[in-house]
A protein has these predicted regions:
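Extended, highly charged segments
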Residues: 1-347
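A short, hydrophobic C-terminal helix/tail in secreted or cell-surface proteins
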Residues: 348-353
């Protein structure tokens, strides 16, 4: 499996899933929760004619929010799943909120649509800092995926009983569709580094995978333009990147999404068929579920293979060591007849009176 696979869900992918959920499952009744893995929770919601399962993972290697098929019943006895299951019993999910390019998702629950909000589930999808929070109507933390002590963070302490506060404010620029090419170029040219990091360090919502997508869809002279220092990139190539940059912003803002794959193991939710010559007849949420299901299983297999290889290597070394010990003992024992004769002679010598 190549580096960067499975692809980390960026804000564009998150936004595409939330757009689907907002359109298709609100309002809906909470039904149950289970925790199949330490860093993953699965939630079930029931509508008038359908049942929807969601999976949220705060695993640092692959944080994600997905609509999934009905899973096996695993992890119903975990403390977190019990707290959520009992706390949200008979409640309805009435809103899903996520602001602009922020990676914080808020699920709001009430006894019925129109009532005051009684509980919240907050999902923070921020790489190794990802987390889940279960809050009351005063934003007091009832349960949390992973606790953060004051010694671990200078910004906020995360523990049950404390009041929830969001992550630090993102001070980078917000991408704007009406920004001019010159303004965009001036903004990313302040520090002369690779185009990839110029974009990541300047604008909100830019991930390494987005820079790769812009590179793939842009007709530039250099096929690896994102790794090139911005001072050495021609104006024509920058304008080509900027053209697709504005397309991305437009589709992000207008929730215009479609799933496609590129470079074998990577995906995009804002490319269209005419841009990459790709036909996909499966809907976006199903495609995302299939992608992560396949690649996460492959990753587990690879980790298991490496574990088995380590065990075999260790056992082989032990066997070689034991073989050497036995061989040494055998070599020494080849003269045992001589030693036996000498000792016999000594034992049979007549003793002096």
């Amino acid at each position: 499996m190549q580096k960067g696979v499975p692809q980390i869900m960026d804000i564009t992918s998150i936004r595409s899933v939330l757009h689907y959920l907002t359109k298709n499952i609100l309002p809906t009744k909470f039904e149950t929760a289970q925790q199949p893995e330490p860093n993953t929770i699965q939630l079930c919601f029931r509508g008038v004619n359908s049942q929807t399962w969601l999976e949220f993972s705060w695993n640092g290697d692959s944080p994600r929010i997905l609509k999934i098929n009905k899973p096996e019943k695993i992890g119903r006895e975990s403390t977190l799943s019990k707290q959520i299951r009992y706390g949200l019993k008979y409640m309805a999910l009435i809103s899903i909120d996520q602001d602009d390019f922020e990676r914080v998702i808020k699920f709001s629950f009430a006894k019925k649509p129109g009532d005051e909000i009684d509980k919240y589930l907050i999902f923070e999808l921020m790489g190794k800092h990802s987390n889940i929070f279960y809050l009351d109507n005063k934003l007091k933390i009832i349960a949390v995926g992973k606790q953060i002590k004051s010694s671990q963070s200078s910004f906020r302490t995360i523990s049950t009983g404390s009041i929830y506060s969001g992550p630090p404010v993102n001070l980078k620029k917000q991408p704007r569709e009406d920004e001019s090419f010159q303004s965009w170029k001036d903004s990313i040219s302040i520090v002369p580094e690779s185009l990839k990091y110029c974009l990541i360090n300047t604008y909100q919502g830019v991930s390494p995978i987005l820079t790769k997508q812009l590179e793939v869809v842009s007709a530039t002279v250099n096929s690896e333009i994102m790794e090139k220092n911005i001072d050495f990139i021609s104006n024509s190539d920058l304008k080509e990147i900027f053209k697709n940059w504005k397309i991305w912003i437009n589709r992000f803002k207008n929730n215009n999404f479609k799933f496609s794959t590129f470079n074998n193991d990577f995906y995009c939710v804002w490319f269209f068929d005419k841009e990459i010559n790709y036909e996909n007849k499966i809907d976006l949420c199903t495609s995302l579920e299939n992608y992560y299901d396949y690649h996460l299983k492959q990753k587990k297999i690879e980790l298991l293979e490496k574990k088995i290889e380590r065990i075999i290597f260790k056992q082989t070394n032990n066997e070689k060591k034991n073989l050497n010990i036995q061989y040494d003992l055998l070599t020494k024992s080849e003269k045992h007849e001589v030693y036996k004769a000498v000792s016999y002679t000594h034992l049979t010598l007549p003793t002096k009176a």
